């Protein structure tokens, strides 16, 4: 039987075909996002489809927002993957939202965001903070909107926190016992947590801080230190689920956000020490309330043909350049990507505000680097200009 699961506020459904075991999981996997079950409507294009296979307890799963080959999964993994697709369906219908691959935990009335870094422990640390009484907005995806005034607003999706299994060796017996007591649906890879008083879909909090996690293998104290904003930007560049948004718009709002939201690195080994460190640091926040209309994002233009670059080169009109933490970031006019410039690339970019010939650029480099052979400088410049042209940042003068 075909069923459509309609999540409140979304037009596109999750479509289930002979997938009752997955349907039974949804109230526990997404307890805070109200949804209703209806007979499938052929006129509606689903954001994700799950079909029961002949083999017992297996389901063929297909993401229809970012099409890829269907994959066979068990019921828990099918529900997990559907929640990831839900994080793409939300901004697909709301042009004011981008979704970050990150965890977000409420502390003293603001959200502390932990951008995804492989094996850094964001989900486990989020669970440890939940155990200490802090509400988890998400362990995996944080939707953000950007009001005209004040910090960005983070939004809950009402999805239950999920832990990767097995738990890390650094987790103590008390944490293991707590997880066992609150565990919901699980398989060998993941365990969802049944937690009381968690935020419902649509609940918002101002962003308080970005915290880059640095989990240590050996024992040691937890340490929180301020870092430059570009370190957060470098991480966030690769953690945006909303890939159809115009990169110039994203660069604009992130530059403003990172100018006002502090960035830290948390080095830690044990969970309890990390929780204590975060609680000590984030007891209160500076005054400031988000207000005004939220930014709306243009869509990127991926089909545009880029012009060939000849002997004379210049910046292409319509690009966006922003300095974040002392580092220059550029977005092309079509909004297809954001690019970090090193010192040399930034200097060349500034020179190309006016049309310049390649030989003129080599001459400038020869003055700046007299100990490097002209042939090498010319080769390095050619490679840099080719990369800038491929990124759509420079064009013919």
Regions found by a protein language model. Give the residues of each.
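Long, basic/Gly/Ser/Thr-rich N-terminal segments
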Residues: 1-81, 85-86, 280-289, 301-306, ...
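Glycine-rich, often acidic-flanked micro-motifs
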Residues: 4, 8-12, 17-26, 103-108, ...
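N-terminal pre-Walker A segment at the start of P-loop NTPase domains
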Residues: 79-99
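Conserved lysine of the Walker
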Residues: 122
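Low-complexity, glycine/alanine/valine/leucine- and proline-rich hydrophobic stretches
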Residues: 227-243, 322, 326, 332-350
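Long, charge-rich, low-complexity alpha-helical segments
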Residues: 289-290, 334-397
């Amino acid at each position: 039987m075909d069923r459509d699961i309609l999540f409140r506020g979304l037009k596109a459904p999750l479509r289930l075909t002979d997938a009752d075991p997955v349907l039974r999981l949804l109230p526990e996997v997404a307890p805070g996002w109200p949804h209703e079950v209806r007979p499938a409507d052929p006129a509606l294009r689903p954001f994700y489809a799950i079909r029961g296979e002949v083999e017992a307890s297996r389901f063929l799963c297909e993401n229809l927002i970012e099409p890829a080959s269907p994959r066979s999964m068990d019921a828990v993994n099918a529900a997990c993957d559907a929640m990831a697709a839900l994080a793409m369906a939300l901004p697909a219908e709301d042009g004011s939202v981008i979704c970050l691959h990150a965890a977000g935990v409420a502390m003293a009335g603001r959200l502390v965001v932990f951008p995804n870094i492989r094996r850094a422990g964001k989900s486990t640390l989020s669970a440890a903070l939940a155990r200490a009484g802090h509400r988890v907005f998400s362990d995996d995806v944080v939707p953000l909107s950007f009001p005209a005034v004040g910090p960005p607003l983070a939004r809950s999706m009402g999805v239950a926190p999920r832990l990767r299994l097995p738990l890390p060796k650094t987790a103590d017996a008390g944490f293991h016992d707590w997880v066992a007591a609150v565990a919901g649906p699980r398989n060998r890879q993941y365990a969802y947590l049944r937690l009381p008083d968690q935020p419902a879909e649509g609940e918002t909090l101002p962003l308080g801080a970005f915290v880059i996690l640095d989990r240590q293998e050996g024992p040691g104290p937890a340490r929180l230190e301020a870092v430059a904003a570009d370190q957060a930007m470098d991480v966030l560049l690769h953690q945006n689920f909303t890939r159809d948004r115009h990169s110039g718009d994203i660069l604009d709002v992130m530059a403003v956000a990172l100018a006002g939201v502090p960035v830290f690195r948390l080095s830690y080994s044990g969970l309890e020490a990390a929780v204590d460190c975060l609680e000590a640091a984030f007891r209160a926040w500076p005054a400031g309330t988000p207000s005004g209309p939220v930014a709306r994002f243009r869509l990127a233009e991926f089909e545009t043909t880029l012009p060939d670059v000849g002997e004379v080169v210049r910046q292409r009109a319509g690009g966006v350049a922003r300095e974040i933490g002392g580092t220059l970031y550029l977005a092309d006019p079509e909004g297809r990507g954001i690019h970090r410039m090193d010192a040399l690339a930034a200097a060349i970019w500034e020179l190309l505000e006016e049309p310049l010939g390649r030989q003129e650029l080599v001459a400038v480099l020869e003055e700046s680097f007299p100990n490097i052979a002209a042939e090498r400088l010319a080769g390095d410049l050619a490679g840099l200009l080719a990369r800038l042209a491929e990124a759509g940042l420079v064009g013919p003068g």
